[in-house]
From Swiss-Prot:
Source organism, top-level taxon: Bacteria
The protein's name: AAA ATPase forming ring-shaped complexes
Gene Ontology process terms (BP): modification-dependent protein catabolic process; proteasomal protein catabolic process
Quaternary structure annotation from Swiss-Prot or TrEMBL: Homohexamer. Assembles into a hexameric ring structure.
Binding site for ATP: G236, C237, G238, K239, T240, L241
Coiled coil start-end: 4-50
Signal sequence extent: none
Key words, A-Z: ATP-binding, Coiled coil, Nucleotide-binding
Lineage, uppermost ranks: Bacteria, Bacillati, Actinomycetota, Actinomycetes, Mycobacteriales
């Protein structure tokens, strides 16, 4: 009996010990958790008690060897300071232009990311390995310090992100000033897309493509390729299309081993109100062209680069012709020196386009500069048929035979429909018809108008339950489109400046003086 009681008490005590041990483990875990939370709270209190940190831009070390450097030059709070570097940072780990955090006593305690805000500036010239001259948005020159990551990669014309207070360039913005003015990819326009200009296309292919497709023959005959081509003529007749097709044809002919580049420079975008800026941009464009032309190819062949100046008369005017500015007296010589100056221009061809060739300085158009001059005339009847066919393919819904439809439109477009009478001082009056102002751009617009009329007719037919669906573009649509196009052209150009009429009409005598213009309007 006593033994049974003793065993029962012993078992009860064991259970109590197990419960106490379990409770003790829980208390220990709670105590550990409380200690951790207390440490976190103490750390937060210490962090809140710390003074505010200051950020600065690292300018460089003050010692001789990176391994032993613990002094640094930083720019902070509007002044340059020499500060200490925390032992927790690896020696030599800081880079010029990097943002750093300064702790108590202005000690560098943390290396942060590079500065990513600031002003944009254009690099003009390198000064050694770590400095450069830039031009800011106000046109002022400034000497800045290049960040370590930029010292081997930037070149003249690049756009840099500059921290204005410290004067450190921290990043290259991947859009150079030349890239803002040019388009280096090859246009997707072929000669087959151009109608009515077979003669002009043949001339420019002989002038531009042959030197690159058959360089061995040119070397054999000691013949230098032309440096430039001038495309001139009335507006809207395909000058820009021809230039794009040249670049595309060269790219296709030479293949991937020596791709061509097409730098499309819009004349007005080169203009700048600051003295010397336009000339500098021209230098940058030709410098970029030389770099592209000198890039090695897979088979060692030549890499053609085409610089296309659109609206050339806007910037390269005859020297001395300026009324409120004499800008052309320095801009024109800059182009002349690039074309045939001391620095050789190899594998680079300049193509200019203008509809006011009489305004361009004669020195630019002499042989040795723009060697080839090709006039792009207004399309003839046959040329108009080819242009209609380019914009009006068989796949477009139409009524009847497409060829007959195009012939009808051409006859309507070239019908005798008087537009204006020009009165000359020393010659008989001359009647100009609407056909005298036909251009490729006008034909393209006529086709677009006819397509819109056909679409509207199809939509109207779809809303009504009766009637057959329209067959597509009809002769009536083309007639309406031609009439609308000619009606809109009735007062463009206006009679306010009679000389403008003589300049846009081919065949007018150069010495003829227009004394009056009589608009005759559209005849039904």
């Amino acid at each position: 009996m006593n033994d049974a009681t003793h065993s029962q008490e012993l078992g009860q005590q064991r259970r109590q010990i197990e419960q106490l041990a379990e409770r003790n483990a829980k208390l220990a875990a709670l105590l550990k958790d409380a200690r951790t939370k207390l440490q976190q709270m103490l750390a937060e209190v210490d962090a809140l008690a710390e003074p505010a940190s200051t950020y600065g831009v690292f300018l460089g070390y003050s010692g001789r060897a990176h391994d032993s450097r613990r002094d640094a030059e930083v720019y902070t709070n509007g002044r340059a300071m020499r500060v200490k570097i925390s032992p927790n940072l690896e020696p030599g780990s800081l880079k010029v232009g990097q943002q750093v955090r300064l702790g108590e006593g202005f000690v560098i305690v943390e290396a942060c990311a590079p500065v990513n805000t600031g002003a944009l500036a254009t690099l003009q010239e390198r000064l050694g390995t770590d400095r450069a001259v830039v031009i800011n948005s106000s046109g002022e020159e400034q000497v800045i310090l290049l960040a370590a990551a930029l010292r081997d990669t930037v070149r003249a014309g690049d756009t840099l992100l500059v921290e204005p207070k410290s004067g450190v360039a921290t990043e290259r913005v991947h859009k150079t000033e030349v890239a803002q003015l040019t388009l280096e990819e090859v246009p997707d326009v072929s000669y087959e897309d151009i109608g009515g200009l077979d003669e002009q296309i043949s001339l420019i292919r002989d002038s531009v493509e042959l030197p690159f497709l058959h360089p061995e023959l040119y070397r054999k005959y000691d013949l230098q390729p032309p440096k430039g081509v001038l495309l001139y003529g009335p507006p809207g007749c395909g000058k820009t299309l021809i230039a794009k097709a040249v670049a595309h044809s060269l790219s296709v002919s030479l293949g991937a081993t020596a791709p061509s580049y097409f730098l499309n420079v819009k004349g007005p975008e080169l203009l700048n109100k600051f003295v010397g800026e336009t000339e500098r941009r021209i230098r940058l464009i030709f410098e970029r062209a030389r770099e592209l032309a000198s890039e090695p190819t897979e088979d060692g062949s030549q890499r053609p680069v085409i610089i296309f100046f659109d609206e050339m008369e806007s910037i390269f005017r005859t020297r001395g012709s300026g009324v409120s500015s004499d800008m052309e007296t320095t801009v024109v010589p800059q182009l002349l020196t690039e074309l045939d100056g001391v620095e050789k221009l190899s594998n680079v061809i300049v193509i200019g386009a203008t509809n006011r060739e009489e305004l361009i300085d004669p020195a630019i158009m002499r042989p040795g500069r723009l060697d080839i001059k090709i006039r792009v005339n207004r399309p003839t009847k046959q040329g108009a048929r080819e242009i209609f066919a380019r914009h009006f393919p068989e796949s477009v819904p139409h009524e009847g035979d497409l060829s007959q439809l195009i012939d009808t439109a051409v006859e309507d477009l070239y019908a005798e429909r008087p537009f204006v009478t020009l009165h000359f001082a020393n010659a008989d009056p001359r009647v100009l018809h609407y056909r005298d102002f036909v251009s490729g751009a006008m034909i393209a617009n006529i086709v677009s108008r006819a397509k819109k009329l056909a679409i509207k007719e199809a939509l109207d037919a779809a809303t009504t339950s009766e009637g057959a669906q329209p067959a597509g573009i009809t002769a009536a649509h083309l007639h309406q489109a031609i009439a609308a196009e000619q009606a809109e052209s009735e007062y463009v150009p206006t009679s306010a400046n009679p000389e403008e009429w003589a300049k846009i009409v081919a065949g007018t005598s150069a010495g003829a003086h227009v004394t009056g213009v009589e608009l005759m309007g559209v005849k039904p």
